[in-house]
Amino acid sequence: MNILVVDDEMDIRTLFEQKFRKEIKDKVFTFQFAHSGEAALELLQTEGSSIVLILSDINMPGMSGIELLKRVRIVHPSAPPKVFMITAYGDKENRESASTLGADDFLTKPIDFASLKEKLQ
């Protein structure tokens, strides 16, 4: 399973990689990382359908996670990757916007990696 993690903070991307390797320990997962919504779209164009899950922060400079979700749903209407939105706070407005656009799930920081692993099974 090819997973794209999108977050503007390098520390968060590094933490995701370390936690996945340590706590999930599953060889079927491969990871790619993008520092922005724009970089994520570029990766999606080159990788095509190999990315099956996007874990995207909602609040990023430039293109937000909400805008990324919107564009992913437009570019991949028939077989879109799953998109889990990540936020440091569970504000209702962002959740409603993301739900309306087709977000598959929400994760609140700090991430519970055991729970995430269950969702990925």
Language-model segments: residues:
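Receiver (REC) domain active-site loop signature in two-component systems and cognate sites
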Residues: M60
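Hydrophobic/aromatic residues positioned on beta-strands within the core alpha/beta folds
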Residues: F84-I86
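Helix N-cap/capping motif at the beta->alpha junctions
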Residues: F33-E42, G65
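Two-component/phosphorelay signaling modules centered on CheY-like receiver
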Residues: M10-Q32
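Active-site beta3 strand of CheY-like receiver
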Residues: G48-L55
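A Lys-centered signature of the CheY-like receiver
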Residues: K109
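Short amphipathic alpha-helix used as the core "switch/output" element in two-component signaling
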Residues: E42, I66-A79
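Alpha4 helix (beta4-alpha4-beta5 surface) of REC/receiver domains from two-component response regulators
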Residues: E67, P80, G90-D105, S115-E118
